[in-house]
A protein has these predicted regions:
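Helix-boundary and loop/linker segments of multi-pass membrane transporters
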Residues: 4-6, 51-56, 102-104, 130
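Nucleotide and nucleotide-moiety/phosphate-recognizing core
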Residues: 11, 15, 61-65, 71-126, ...
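Cytosolic, membrane-interface loops and tails of multi-pass inner-membrane proteins
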Residues: 29-62, 131
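N-terminal signal-anchor transmembrane alpha helix
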Residues: 10-36
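Interfacial segments of multi-pass membrane proteins
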Residues: 54-58, 116, 120, 134-162
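Transmembrane helix boundary and interhelical junction motifs in multipass membrane proteins
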Residues: 24-30, 129-137
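N-terminal membrane topogenic signal
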Residues: 1-11
Length: 162
């Protein structure tokens, strides 16, 4: 029985690390460093987010940042779903998990990877824990995890912000 618990803990730990380190890949820092050859954190508000990047460099490069931030969220959730679909803590090929049990593992893995992807975006260990605000990453994750919740959240955001 303890093996089953430790297998689940280890698998969740791998998913959490995967989500966090994918989140640490901040799109605005990567684009400003490798394409523009500058550091976005040295300008305007000093934040490594999309808003500061847009204010500093304009819309042309901001689309690359949007793509990077959305792709890292998609990658974190997709890899977590892939790992969750292959995860069976019992290691019994004769008695596989039911579809409901497997779907529950996949859902839990996706939520944990997504949450830690946002945490990695906001507090990246690669940038002295100074990251973005996590808005675009969170919006992408809500769309990936449940489109109905994303629709409600985005509508409220549009009404309150605009």
């Amino acid at each position: 029985m303890t093996y089953l618990v430790w297998a689940a803990v280890f698998a969740m730990f791998v998913v959490v690390l995967l989500g966090y380190f994918l989140g640490c890949l901040n799109g605005s820092v990567l684009v400003s460093h490798f394409i523009i050859r500058d550091d976005v954190r040295q300008h305007d508000s000093g934040n490594a987010g999309l808003t500061n990047f847009y204010r500093t460099y304009g819309a042309r490069y901001a689309l690359l940042v949007i793509a990077c931030d959305m792709l890292k969220a998609v990658a974190a959730v997709s890899l977590a779903a892939w790992l969750g679909a292959r995860f069976d803590p019992r290691m019994l090929p004769d008695l596989p998990l039911t579809a409901a049990e497997q779907a529950e593992y996949v859902l839990h893995f996706k939520y944990w990877a997504g949450f830690f992807c946002v945490v990695g975006h906001m507090f990246p260990c690669t940038a002295k824990f100074r990251g973005g605000k996590g808005i675009l990453c969170s919006a992408t994750l809500t769309l990936l995890l449940d489109w109905r919740i994303a629709l409600v959240c985005w509508s409220l955001f549009a009404v309150l912000w605009l």
